């Protein structure tokens, strides 16, 4: 029983940690490319900004889905039925 709970805790930590890391990398790339595009064509900056915010929202959604799955695994422990 302790092994299953321990492995579940490790899986939850990896899921949340990797989701946060991926989001941070994604936001860094997104912001950098937005600044490059706005510097190259300043007249396109408002349109690029709208698209950047849409993609930023999708990046956050992926992380929140990962957190939801992690909390589901943590509190319901679907692997507990294997015991």
Swiss-Prot record:
Query: Topology versus the membrane, per the UniProt entry?
Result: Multi-pass membrane protein
Against Pfam families, the record matches this protein to: ATP-synt_C (PF00137)
GO molecular function list = lipid binding; proton-transporting ATP synthase activity, rotational mechanism
Specify where it is mainly localized: membrane
| Site note Reversibly protonated during proton transport, residues | 60
| Compartment(s) | Cell inner membrane
Similarity field = Belongs to the ATPase C chain family.
Quaternary structure annotation from Swiss-Prot or TrEMBL? F-type ATPases have 2 components, F(1) - the catalytic core - and F(0) - the membrane proton channel. F(1) has five subunits: alpha(3), beta(3), gamma(1), delta(1), epsilon(1). F(0) has three main subunits: a(1), b(2) and c(10-14). The alpha and beta chains form an alternating ring which encloses part of the gamma chain. F(1) is attached to F(0) by a central stalk formed by the gamma and epsilon chains, while a peripheral stalk is formed by the delta and b chains.
* Protein name listed in UniProt: ATP synthase subunit c
């Amino acid at each position: 029983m302790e092994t299953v709970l321990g492995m579940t805790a490790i899986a939850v930590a990896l899921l949340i940690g990797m989701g946060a890391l991926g989001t941070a990398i994604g936001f860094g790339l997104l912001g950098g490319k937005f600044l490059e595009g706005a510097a190259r064509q300043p007249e396109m900056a408002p349109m690029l900004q709208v698209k950047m915010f849409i993609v930023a929202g999708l990046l956050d959604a992926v992380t929140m889905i990962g957190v939801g799955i992690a909390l589901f695994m943590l509190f319901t422990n679907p692997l507990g039925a294997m015991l």
